[in-house]
Amino acid sequence: RLGDSRKLCVTTDKFIGIGLHCMGKLFGTNGVRGVFSEDFTLEFVHDLVLSISTYFKEGTILVGYDGRNSSKVISKIVCSTLNSAGINSDLAGLVPTPCLEFATKTLGYNGGIMITASHNPPEYNGIKPVASDGVEISREDENVIEEIFFQKNWNQNTSEFGSTKNDDRSIQTYLDGIKSQVDISKIKSKNLKVALDLGNGAQTITAIKLCEQLGCETIAINQEIDGTFSGRGPEPTPYNLEELSSAVVNNNADLGVAFDGDGDRSIFCDNTGKLLSGDKSALLLSNYLLKKNPNSKVVTCINSGNSIDEIVTQTDSTVIRTKVGSVEVSRKMLSENALIGFEENGGFMFGKHNHVRDGGMTLALFLELISNKDIIEELA
């Protein structure tokens, strides 16, 4: 099950390989994932983090985790393993994935480790290494870590242990970064009302604060952190967002938004309660942002629709397509200095903030969009 639900191939030597042919693959499309205490054991976490420590070599690593029941105990193993390899760790605590990523970059860390299984069922957990630029490490660097892991070529010859301390700067650093990219006064002038389906996930920590700091009234549902995601599950889908649509209609809200388990993706609905697909919301934002920033680049996956082509043509911009996977989009955005990246599943990336999927940043951009133009007009 490690590596996004691929079966673990176990022989007499633990974790010889993963996949149908035991090819020695750990990373899936987004980090390393497995079922906690089955294939994603604490022993496995220790060995994986030793491999990540060997890859990072030195410096201080920022560690964060989502609200899953196993996340906090895994964070203790992560930090102690980093320390045993001579690397210091700062613990950000329970934060959304994009918060950890932005803080890693902005606060000058050598790297980050996010403990999350994103939208996977509650019994899963995972580890996502983040580079010093605030973006998930490249496929090439994933291969380096896998080689270290399977060869057990760990750097354990350290004369000094590292240490762990708490760092409470990440959340406000993240919120300040988002606010710096939008017209706060414009948003505040509209006195917007927003329905938030927090999905019992990590955006509970930041999304309400963000809306309040942008002068918005909020209606929150599924707002208690719950590692079992008892409200509607960790993955927002058209089949489990009826409560969000009803909250928008019943409270005369201007916008509704639902987040996945770790808060890097967002699904929106308009002020009539109609849900927007990930592609549709990405097109609305792209059209808005490219009109403000013509001659820009947009990166998206090969499985996204072709509607973006007309928008980029009208704004003298270009679209670049990549393999499926947020890492592919993020890394291509960096190399091309792209303004926008998106996936059809609700993952939207705004390059001026960070080249990663970010449910909070996407929400703020949507609030600015509807502050300038009625979303119903945009949808027409």
Regions found by a protein language model. Name each.
Residues 23-85, 111, 164-192:
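An N-terminal, well-structured beta->alpha segment
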Residues 50, 61-125, 210-269:
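N-terminal small/polar loop signature for handling phosphorylated ligands or for N-terminal nucleophile
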Residues 35, 125-251:
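Gly/Ser/Thr-enriched, mixed-charge loops and adjacent short helices
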Residues 110-124, 248-270, 274-275, 319-357:
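Glycine-rich phosphate-binding loop
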Residues 293-380:
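Phosphate-binding and adjacent anionic-ligand microenvironments
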